[in-house]
Amino acid sequence: MTIWVDADACPNVIKEILYRAAERMQLPLILVANQALRVPPSRFIRTLRVAAGFDVADNEIVRQCKAGDLVITADIPLAAEVLEKGAAVLNPRGERYSDATIRERLTMRDFMDTLRASGVQTGGPNTLSPRDRQHFAAELDKWWLESQRKK
């Protein structure tokens, strides 16, 4: 099992939670980004720098993740692709995507893209709240416990 992070867009506070979790769970944590990242020294934490470009980091995560891995991303198309490979997906707000929910998310994303393309300003997501951080940490722990039961 490996935790993969779409690190270019992942909030720093979520990365901090992941650093502590990787140590506690003794699991590989790989942060994939198109820029250099500073991470704490750890035998469990590493970065994977990819070339700059549209979806380069996403494509690398899809290529390398396996069933049973966890992917941290807010990118809906990336989430859909790794779900097809049998990986679990958690967004930085603590929402776990599933085969049942990802289709609805893809539809909503496409609708919002259409609105933006027609000139409608849709705004971005709200800032990450303390409640979001707690929810993320709780869902991460829940995934870990479920993974341990499956062994």
From Swiss-Prot:
Domain of life (superkingdom): Bacteria
InterPro entries: UPF0178
Family indicated by similarity: Belongs to the UPF0178 family.
UniProt-recorded name of the protein: UPF0178 protein YaiI
Name of the coding gene: yaiI
